[in-house]
Every structure is written in structure tokens, then in C-alpha cells.
Regions:
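Short acidic alpha-helix that forms the nucleotide-activated donor recognition element
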Residues: 17-28, 50, 64, 68
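Conserved acidic donor-binding segment of nucleotide-sugar-dependent glycosyltransferases
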Residues: 69-70, 74-81, 90-96, 110
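Acidic donor-binding loop of glycosyltransferase active sites
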Residues: 26-40, 53
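Conserved donor-nucleotide binding/catalytic region of nucleotide-linked donor-dependent transferases
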Residues: 1, 90-110, 127-131
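C-terminal alpha-helical cap of glycosyltransferases
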Residues: 114-134
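Nucleotide-activated donor-binding/catalytic signature segment of Leloir-type glycosyltransferases, i.e.
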Residues: 1-17
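Short hydrophobic beta-strand element within catalytic cores of glycosyltransferases
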Residues: 54-57, 67
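Short glycine/acidic-rich beta->alpha loop that forms part of the nucleotide-sugar donor binding site
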Residues: 37-42, 49, 59
Length: 134
């Protein structure tokens, strides 16, 4: 808070303290995940989708496994703050886009339920063992 005050941006920030993301995310206009290093399958992206919030993230390979740009989220060039700001501005100023991203994200997260993931692993194991997907 003190650093924000020193920078003169304290009136622009909300610092709610520790809250569960599921409780906080529905109050957000968008979820921004600007990672510059890979982190596997991002739980944050899925949390955004579960709560119906449009997702904006860096175009890391791991994020692109989840996010289809302009379909279920927006992708920004990794480490490029201008690209990230442009994606944020697009999302915040285009209500139709924001609604579509949230709806598609909510559908996309269904691909990652425990049951669905287990089915996909079992299909993979069967194919690797040469038994098809009976």
C-alpha cells in the first residue's frame, strides 16, 4: 500500500488482502495471467473460466495448450507489456468480445474435469498398448 501511495496510484488499486480466487474472480472484468516462464497447465486460467471471467494471458506454449486466441481467451506476446495492454484494452472496451470469451472459456473448462482427464489418459494408454479405444 505504501509503495502504491508513493507512486501515486493507490486510488487506482484495490488491495483486498487474502481472498479465495473463486470468491474474488466473479467481481473482476478479466483475469490477466502475464507469466513469462512456463508453468504447465495453468490452474489460474481454468479458475477464470470456472468463474465466468474472460482470460487474457501471455502466449507461452503451456497457455496456448488451453487458450485459443480470440476464441476462449486473448493471447499477448510473452514479455511484451504493450501487447498485454492492447489485449486488456480490447477486452475491456468490447463487451461482445468479453461476453464471448467468458462463454467459450466456461465451455472450455469442461474439457478439464477429473473424469474427462482420466478418460483421455485411459484412451492414450490403450492406444500406446495397441488396443484402440474400445
Amino acid at each position: 500500500k505504501e509503495e502504491a501511495r508513493n507512486l501515486g496510484v493507490d486510488a487506482l488499486l484495490a488491495l483486498p488482502g487474502r481472498r479465495d480466487s473463486v470468491d474474488m474472480l466473479p467481481d473482476c472484468d478479466a483475469l490477466v495471467v502475464p507469466s513469462v516462464d512456463g508453468e504447465g497447465s495453468s490452474g489460474a486460467i481454468k479458475e477464470g473460466w470456472v468463474t465466468g471471467v474472460p482470460v487474457i494471458c501471455s502466449a507461452l506454449a503451456s497457455n496456448q495448450e488451453l487458450v485459443r486466441g480470440d476464441e476462449n481467451g486473448l493471447l499477448a506476446a510473452v514479455g511484451d507489456p504493450v501487447s498485454l495492454a492492447d489485449a486488456m484494452a480490447r477486452c475491456l472496451t468490447d463487451e461482445g468480445l468479453r461476453v464471448r470469451l467468458a462463454e467459450e472459456g466456461s465451455r472450455s473448462v469442461l474439457e478439464f474435469t477429473d473424469t474427462r482427464m482420466a478418460e483421455q489418459y485411459m484412451d492414450l494408454y490403450r492406444r500406446l498398448m495397441g488396443k484402440g479405444t474400445e
